[in-house]
């Protein structure tokens, strides 16, 4: 084992053997690199000679007079004033292209470029072109004459070399627009977006303003169904649009008959005491247009008037509707009592039922909204059984106690005037055939 180990050590160690055949001779430090260095030197010399030959050939391309003229012009300009950014490498042209013959300026520019490329290799092409253009404009006719003559010679030579030559400019790629076009397009897009946003806002105002708009406008716009307390939105025009829309929609409701508002989303219980205490913002005279026209209360031909008036007050989202209902109820009571006093001949006709029995509204047929609520029995609507007519006068002057004025409409008894289950069994109420001027003394504004 010891002999094997010694043999292996001798084999592994580079200097352990004395046999010159096993160990290579130590080489001088320049032995491996000398051939490569010689090759590199030869290649550099060849490249230098090639560059010199190319420069000589390029110099031979221009006559001596052109080179002298270029030197004469360039010697008078300090090229150290031109900024020298990093040169950008241009893309190589894959397809050969026959160039146009150079004009006088191109002859001057190319000859000057070749001379300046050796002296100032870091000049940027754009800055060089601008400077050459400035110098060309400063030259007089005598300085330009050699370049003009050379350009004419090149044109004749080009005509001989390419007799069928036709100038075909390359088409500009439409992928990238110019900076000016990009700015214009962005401005146009911004203007269109602002116009669209303005139209969208106005469209929302229109949909909110008119009750005769789409039935799903309240759902689609995402507005709450609470009372229209200002300021619910930052825009004050929206409130004006709402009031105008209601005013316009009242005529359409009277003429059309069936309103487009879903009463399932309207609840009088949503009225707060703050809204009741701020009722001075609503004009009392504004709600006179919602009162039904002259006619018999129980007559079927005038049911549409009551239906449209109640549909519109329901569309007012609880706040104004409570005010209009209180005003209407009190005025109807006052009118009926006035008729009782004036028409003494028909006293027995009015004593058959209480003076407030005309508030039963038994013939109010709302089949469109009847499915939203269960059928209501008659006693919930018979106001004469629950409350005397004097409650309208005792609570009409108190804005904060309008809930007590509507004590017949407690939270569990808010049917929103749906169809009554037994309309045939209830006697139709009687009201005067002609409406008199409303009495405003019975309901004072808070």
Swiss-Prot record:
Signal peptide: none
An example molecular function term from Gene Ontology annotations: DNA-binding transcription factor activity, RNA polymerase II-specific
Keyword Cell membrane annotated: no
Residue ranges, compositional bias (Acidic residues): 36-48
Keyword NAD: no
Feature: compositional bias, Polar residues: 213-226, 426-446
Protein's name in the database: Transcription factor Sox-10
Gene name of the record: sox10
């Amino acid at each position: 084992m010891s002999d094997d180990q010694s043999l292996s050590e001798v084999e592994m160690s580079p200097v352990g053997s004395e046999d010159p055949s096993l160990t290579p001779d130590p080489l001088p430090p320049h032995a491996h690199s000398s051939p490569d260095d010689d090759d590199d030197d030869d290649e550099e010399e060849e490249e230098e000679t090639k560059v010199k030959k190319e420069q000589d050939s390029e110099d031979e391309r221009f006559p001596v007079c052109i080179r002298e003229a270029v030197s004469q012009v360039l010697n008078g300009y300090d090229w150290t004033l031109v900024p020298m950014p990093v040169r950008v490498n241009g893309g190589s042209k894959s397809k050969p292209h026959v160039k146009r013959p150079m004009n006088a300026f191109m002859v001057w520019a190319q000859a000057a470029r070749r001379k300046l490329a050796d002296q100032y290799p870091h000049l940027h092409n754009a800055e060089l072109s601008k400077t050459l253009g400035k110098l060309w404009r400063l030259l007089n006719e005598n300085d330009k004459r050699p370049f003009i003559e050379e350009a004419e010679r090149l044109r004749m030579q080009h005509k001989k070399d390419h007799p069928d030559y036709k100038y075909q400019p390359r088409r500009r790629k439409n992928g990238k627009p110019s900076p000016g076009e990009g700015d214009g397009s962005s401005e146009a897009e911004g203007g269109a977006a602002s116009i669209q946003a303005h139209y969208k806002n106005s469209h929302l105002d229109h949909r909110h303003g008119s009750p005769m708009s789409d039935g799903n406008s309240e759902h689609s716009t995402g507005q709450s169904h609470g009372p229209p307390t200002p300021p619910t939105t930052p825009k004050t025009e929206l409130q004006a649009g709402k009031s105008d829309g209601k005013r316009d929609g009242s005529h359409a409701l009277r003429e059309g008959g069936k309103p487009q508002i879903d009463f399932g989303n309207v609840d009088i219980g949503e009225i707060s005491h703050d809204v009741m205490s701020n009722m001075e913002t609503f004009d009392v005279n504004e709600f006179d247009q919602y009162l039904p026209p002259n006619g018999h209360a129980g007559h079927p031909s005038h049911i549409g008037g009551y239906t449209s008036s109640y549909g519109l007050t329901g569309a007012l989202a609880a706040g104004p509707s409570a005010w209009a209902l209180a005003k209407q109820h009190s005025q109807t009571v006052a009118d009926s009592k006035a008729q009782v006093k004036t028409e003494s001949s028909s006293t027995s006709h009015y004593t058959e039922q209480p003076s407030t029995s005309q508030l039963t509204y038994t013939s109010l047929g709302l089949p469109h909204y009847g499915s939203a609520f269960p059928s209501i029995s008659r006693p919930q609507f018979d106001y004469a059984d629950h409350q005397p007519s004097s409650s309208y006068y005792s609570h009409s002057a108190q804005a904060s106690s309008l809930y007590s004025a509507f004590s017949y409409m407690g939270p569990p008894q808010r049917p929103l005037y749906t169809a009554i289950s037994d309309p045939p069994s209830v006697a139709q109420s009687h009201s005067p055939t002609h409406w008199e001027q409303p009495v405003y003394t019975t309901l004072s504004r808070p």
